[in-house]
Amino acid sequence: MRYIRLCIISLLATLPLAVHASPQPLEQIKLSESQLSGRVGMIEMDLASGRTLTAWRADERFPMMSTFKVVLCGAVLARVDAGDEQLERKIHYRQQDLVDYSPVSEKHLADGMTVGELCAAAITMSDNSAANLLLATVGGPAGLTAFLRQIGDNVTRLDRWETELNEALPGDARGTTTPASMAATLRKLLTSQRLSARSQRQLLQWMVDDRVAGPLIRSVLPAGWFIADKTGAGERGARGIVALLGPNNKAERIVVIYLRDTPASMAERNQQIAGIGAALIEHWQR
């Protein structure tokens, strides 16, 4: 009997450790806000139903940064579906069209790039000049905002071009969205009739091929899980990611995480987003 009591006591002693080692998603977000001395906005949404599963500051505005490039390429694909654009169309540009961080487009000054290649560069490598060239095809920031209104997003707005849109001034609504609005818009682009099935597959594939998101949720993704994502980084501690996740290599949920107004380093911001992602995944697996 004494042996059984000792076993029970030993088992109970381990329970608090397990809880503290694996915080619930909202607990992790609150911890991240404290450690970052900034603000975190997050939503976890079921892809099929659109039901919100977890949310924190989901209706507060955060800078989009480069996460807008997914919506931009969605607008480009909508034009392709309407017969107003072709992914194979070649766009030529000049040295003066290039802005900071253009790792792909800077190599093609002589031969130009197709619309499809520009979208791939904008999403997979976050190429800023590629994004600006694509923005010009949809009517600039105002044209992209108009597209958002057409598909029912009355919150998200783009007001400037790369790279000025990453300024992330406190209280500035320019170039912002909310986690809830971004998740709903991404869901519309990937599941509704806003885009053809072919264009939906293409947009998703570009996100699957993202090559600059390694330190974030991808760093904590279990084996066999699906991820398609796009990150963003800005001034004044702004950082963000929009992603689709799921076990068994299937996209089942949309996760949007934004940070702002933190003095933390890029490495610290990446670590906090990864920690939130890990908490979401672990809670999902229970």
From Swiss-Prot:
EC number: 3.5.2.6
Enzyme class name: hydrolase
Disulfide bonds: 73-119
PANTHER family found in the cross-reference section: BETA-LACTAMASE (PTHR35333), BETA-LACTAMASE-TYPE TRANSPEPTIDASE FOLD CONTAINING PROTEIN (PTHR35333:SF3)
Biological role stated in the UniProt entry: Hydrolyzes ampicillin. Can also hydrolyze cephaloridine, aztreonam and ceftazidime with a low catalytic rate.
Note: The class A beta-lactamase family has a specific amino-acid numbering system, sometimes called Ambler or ABL numbering and often misspelt as Amber. A multiple sequence alignment was used to derive a consensus sequence and then the consensus was numbered taking into account insertions and deletions. This allows use of identical numbers, e.g. for active site residues, despite differences in protein length. UniProt always uses natural numbering of residues, hence there appear to be differences in numbering between this entry and some papers.
Protein name: Beta-lactamase SHV-24
Source organism of this protein record: Escherichia coli
Gene, per the UniProt record: bla
